UniProtKB/Swiss-Prot annotation:
The UvrABC repair system catalyzes the recognition and processing of DNA lesions. UvrC both incises the 5' and 3' sides of the lesion. The N-terminal half is responsible for the 3' incision and the C-terminal half is responsible for the 5' incision. HAMAP family: UvrC (MF_00203). The gene is uvrC. GO terms for molecular function: DNA binding; excinuclease ABC activity. Keywords: Cytoplasm, DNA damage, DNA excision, DNA repair, Excision nuclease, SOS response. It comes from Porphyromonas gingivalis (strain ATCC 33277 / DSM 20709 / CIP 103683 / JCM 12257 / NCTC 11834 / 2561). It is found in: Cytoplasm. GO terms for biological process: nucleotide-excision repair; SOS response. One of its GO terms (cellular component) is cytoplasm. Interacts with UvrB in an incision complex. The lineage of its organism: Bacteria, Pseudomonadati, Bacteroidota, Bacteroidia, Bacteroidales. This is UvrABC system protein C. Belongs to the UvrC family. Disulfide bonds: none annotated. Residues 208-243 form the UVR domain.
Length: 600
């Protein structure tokens, strides 16, 4: 069984997405394949709870490593599970090992072709779509087909000569208008085949194309005043729009194909490999390469294609790639770089898995070495803000006042991307009267950095000012007077659009909302707000208490401080009972205070 330390590293990094997981034993053999709507929750359940089932307990004891494949939906996970179980025949999978398969939908190769669900795939020229994750889903698709199109359900031999002989009579389906009666010659082969062509599109998932087609027809019929036909088109559009495909289907004509995708970070290239066979994904593997100087992604992917095809003995006749690599293919091998369609969807699935693999590797590295995560963040900030050095020490300033009363300011400090609360500073604004944020910023920046330089204390690697161009200009001018321009970079964050301003640059930088750099800067700003507003509230409360308590005889400075510390506000002091006040400041003072406040 895997150790607790190994599990603590692996399990928290698993994605909370649908997919399939594979358990391997000490020999590297797949012993179990499962599907999950949420991979992290499902896999964790094997290790974090007791199992009554003896087979499951034995399985868990034999697990030595875990791999997974991310897909788009729970339905896809079910399909992929089926493919992987058939490929590896894992010892602990008791279902599906007998070769039982999920249903497909077939369009038979025959006159007026029948369309129905089947588990029996025959090489008779018929077209198969699927497999579908369960009979209910296949039947649901057939129900949609039959609601839209009047197709036959009988098993009659509808060759032309037999129809001409008049050997058949219409059935109930004809009378309830679910079939147009090709058996008695009421529907031509061309008209029926036109419906079958549209059904192919529907089974391939091309719903949007069908909806567009029916909209165009509806418009044309309306203009020609053919309202009955227009109404039929409208009903078909509504049926299609209500139906939502819950899984991606690998068409059966995509067979024996290798799919490769590429991702990279500063030092490593990641290449994901998927092999498609018989309409299913039966192998997924991600390879890592240590990047060398001046080695292009084309060269790395080309090398990986050769290695992975040899390792897994692939004889795929087609290779799907994200970009041209210059890889030399044999005469019998086709290279495809898809822009749309089913192969593009497969490439996107491979790209999703390689991106998840890279993310999980980073998370596991951070689990083992939290300092690496912090270093990664500050280097990201350096890159995004074009700084000369990584900002390991950042200071952020915020002013706080209400209509110019009790003006204060706060400075919060982040070190290695995290708050360093012991270094936070509060400031009373001393030289500014009235609401003047720019003048307040000049005073605080001047006082703070004059002290740091005079006492030879370390300067920050970056200053963040809460506010737009005006606040930034005020702080920049003050740093210039102190001779610190060029020594400390400074930026301003405008709150409305989260724009980042640089001194003397009218064009702001707008980072992606998911950017780690923006998240750190927002955290700085929010922390400065919180710290500054809290300080301002305390100052106002003290002033309020002083103003209301100053004229009460016998209540001195020390008593006021005790009252503020305990009750936090004048309102609470006023609502307190005399006994509660007595317990804090004594009976005599409590009586004076209680009576004095009520006179007011």
């Amino acid at each position: 069984m895997m150790t607790r330390d190994e599990l603590n590293i692996i399990l928290p990094t698993l994605p909370e997405k649908p997919g399939c997981y594979q358990y391997f034993d000490e020999d590297g053999k797949v012993i179990y394949v499962g599907k999950a709507k949420n991979l992290r929750r499902r896999v964790s359940s094997y290790f974090y709870k007791e199992h009554a089932d003896r087979k499951t307990r034995i399985l868990v004891r034999q697990i030595r490593s875990i791999k997974y494949i991310v897909v788009d939906s729970e339905g896809d996970a079910l399909l992929l599970e089926n493919s992987l179980i058939k490929e590896y025949q894992p010892r602990y999978n008791v279902l599906l090992k007998d070769g039982k398969t999920y249903p497909s939908i077939v369009i038979k190769r025959e006159p007026f072709p029948r369309i129905f669900a089947t588990r029996d795939i025959k090489k008779d020229g018929s077209e198969y779509f699927g497999p579908y994750p369960g009979a209910l889903i296949a039947k649901g698709m057939l129900r949609l087909v039959k609601e839209i199109y009047p197709i036959r359900t009988c098993k009659l031999d509808l060759r032309e000569e037999k129809i001409r002989q008049g050997r058949y009579r219409v059935c109930l389906q004809y009378h309830i208008k679910k079939c147009k009666g090709p058996c008695i010659g009421n529907q031509t082969s061309n008209e029926y085949e036109s419906n079958v062509s549209e059904i192919r599109d529907l089974l391939r998932g091309n719903l949007h194309r069908l909806v567009r087609m029916y909209r165009d027809r509806m418009q044309a019929y309306s203009e020609e005043l053919r309202f009955e036909e227009a109404q039929i088109c409208k009903e078909r559009i509504e049926l299609l729009e209500r139906y939502e495909a819950k899984h991606t289907v690998v068409p059966r004509n995509i067979d024996n194909v290798d799919v490769f995708s590429y991702d990279e970070d500063e030092h490593t290239a990641y290449i994901n490999y998927m092999h498609i066979e018989h309409g299913g994904i039966n192998r997924v593997y991600t390879l890592e390469y240590r990047k060398q100087i001046e080695e292009s992604k084309e060269e790395l992917l080309a090398a990986a294609i050769t290695e992975l095809r040899q390792r897994f003995e692939s004889n795929a006749h087609e290779i799907v790639l994200p970009f041209d690599t210059g890889w030399q293919t044999g005469e019998s091998i086709t290279t495809t770089i898809p822009r749309r369609g089913d192969k593009r969807k497969l490439l996107e699935l491979s790209e999703k898995n390689v991106a998840q693999y890279k993310l999980d590797k980073l998370k596991r590295a951070e689990k083992l070495n939290p300092e690496q995560r912090a270093l990664h963040i500050v280097h990201g900030i350096q890159k995004d803000l074009h700084l000369d050095r990584p900002p390991k020490h950042i200071e952020c300033f915020d002013n706080s006042n209400i209509q110019g009363t009790s003006p204060v300011a706060a400075c919060v400090v982040f070190k290695m991307g995290k708050p360093s609360k012991k270094d936070y500073r509060k400031f009373h604004v001393k030289t500014v009267e009235g609401p003047n944020d720019f003048a307040s910023m000049r005073e605080i920046i001047s006082r703070h950095y004059t002290r740091l330089t005079e006492e030879n204390l370390p300067l920050p690697d970056l200053i963040v000012v809460d506010g737009g161009k005006g606040q930034l200009s005020a702080a920049y001018e003050t740093l210039d007077k102190l001779g610190l321009i060029g020594k400390i970079p400074i930026i301003g964050l405008a709150e409305r659009l989260e724009e980042i301003f640089f001194p003397k640059d009218p064009v702001p930088l707008i980072l992606d909302k998911k950017s780690e750099t923006l998240k750190v800067i927002q955290h700085l700003r929010d922390e400065a707000h919180r710290f500054g507003i809290g300080f301002h509230r305390d100052v106002r409360s003290k002033k309020q208490i002083q103003s209301e308590l100053d004229n009460i005889k016998g209540i001195g400075k020390k008593t006021k401080e005790d009252l503020l510390r305990h009750f936090k506000s004048v309102k609470r002091i006023r609502s307190a009972e005399e006994e509660e006040l007595s317990a804090l400041i004594g009976r005599n003072k409590a009586k004076l205070l209680y009576e004095g406040l009520r006179k007011k």
